């Protein structure tokens, strides 16, 4: 699924209209999609739904939704920012729907009456084409709505049964058409008066602003609904959002006559006296998504600890100095590493392994690489390090590590994560996995894809080790670097979503992801 700018979406809609899928038809489908989503959350009959309607097409989408919910038995109220008179308004008047306009309601008494007991508020005030600061009547309207919503939610009662608190329902449910009014759909900026949504329904494609903060945090659950546009109209758009269909097409096959060699051998060069968990997390993750054989190349001083933590791995104890891999480990590692499909280097190494990393990336070639954590931090200290790394490696930095690799500030990286990832993937000749909410995968040829996950449950120690092991396993099973990175990140994100739904956003530990990785793989493939 592609991610589009406002201008790209405008061109797609214009081309669709010119080819026979008219604006009116697209509006009917858009409004119907919002109605369908609302009805999937609550019974329409008997529900009270308040629509906040602006003067443009976003308001038109809202009016179509209002008509359809009225026909489904909902009690509908329409509150207009400005008076409007079109076929949608005529249809609602014929149905006896309550309609009020802000200029005719100077005390907002009609608005307040509906806000006091509605079940759903639909924000259809401004859509993707608006980027100006909120002001005037629109600002006043949103302030009134926000105040009433806050007051209602503060009064909600927590029921208690058997001394176990029951979660209070969020009432009213706030649904945004395209996204909350005040969102800039090109850069994710958010007006301070924007009304955060519980869910947003956007059309045809997600917009760039849906994936960039702070705006992304105000969209709630994002649902993308088709409106009849031709997918071919987006073929020239580079930025994509990963989805199950795409990932399924890339996942490695599992032939019935396979043996463990079929699914690749992963060498994991990792660990230190201070970090004995990282190698185990990475190795277990690799096995959990299908790697045939995993070998842990770790400091010999922690070999006993390693062998007690994991039964399935094989081991290559290497020389170390004070618990970190030493320069002397390089020759022993090189004697074995050529027979492996991929090498993951970095989890838990610590920066005390500097001489080891410096020597390893000299001389003869290495197998395909996934570089994580302290491998990245140590490479960043080497001038023109990317020329010493066999291309295309997969690099998995978080923003702090990316800052060290690039020399940029974290703030500069976070300001435009996609552009930064693409720029340096091209420059370095390696695949970049820039971790974080909506992780970015960028390839040297300019391809890029965003993960659809913004999950605080993944912000936990060891989560990156699980990700690195998952990506390494995908690479070992024969995927190209870009596809391996995308599949690994998607499986990791899906496992994180499963853990969050079962456990909550707090309390998930990296080990919780391991048991869910096979379930994530099963759910996609």
Predicted regions and their residues:
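Small-residue (G/A/S/T)-rich helix-start motifs and N-terminal tracts that mark the onset
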Residues: 1-81, 197-199, 208-369, 377-395, ...
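Nucleotide and nucleotide-moiety/phosphate-recognizing core
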Residues: 36-127, 131-177, 359-362, 386, ...
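Internal gly/pro-rich beta-alpha loop/helix module
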Residues: 120, 125-241
